[in-house]
Swiss-Prot record:
The species this protein was found in: Pediococcus pentosaceus (strain ATCC 25745 / CCUG 21536 / LMG 10740 / 183-1w)
Record protein name field: Putative membrane protein insertion efficiency factor
Membrane topology value: Peripheral membrane protein
HAMAP family membership: UPF0161_YidD
Main location: membrane
Transmembrane parts of this sequence: none
Listed Pfam families: YidD (PF01809)
Keyword Membrane: yes
Protein's job: Could be involved in insertion of integral membrane proteins into the membrane.
Swiss-Prot/TrEMBL keywords: Cell membrane, Membrane
GO terms under cellular component: plasma membrane
UniProt-annotated location(s): Cell membrane
Amino acid sequence: MKQILLLIIRGYQKFISPMFPPSCRYYPTCSNYSLQAIKRFGAIKGGLMGVARILRCHPFVRGGYDPVPDNFSLKRNQKNSKPRN
């Protein structure tokens, strides 16, 4: 399951994402965040973290640096978050 999710995200990054202008408000991008979360926490927890991150990525949020936390959480990583310039 983990490998399937990683393959889907990499496919999105390679074939779908390049067709649109960059729009992610966070660094790392939502797809990279999802890859890292799934690798670190597995398909279920990492997948949930990726979905939560995508739901947070909208025009009404400041965005900024939001790395995958050391411990499982569906909230933004406030410890290291700084607005993007």
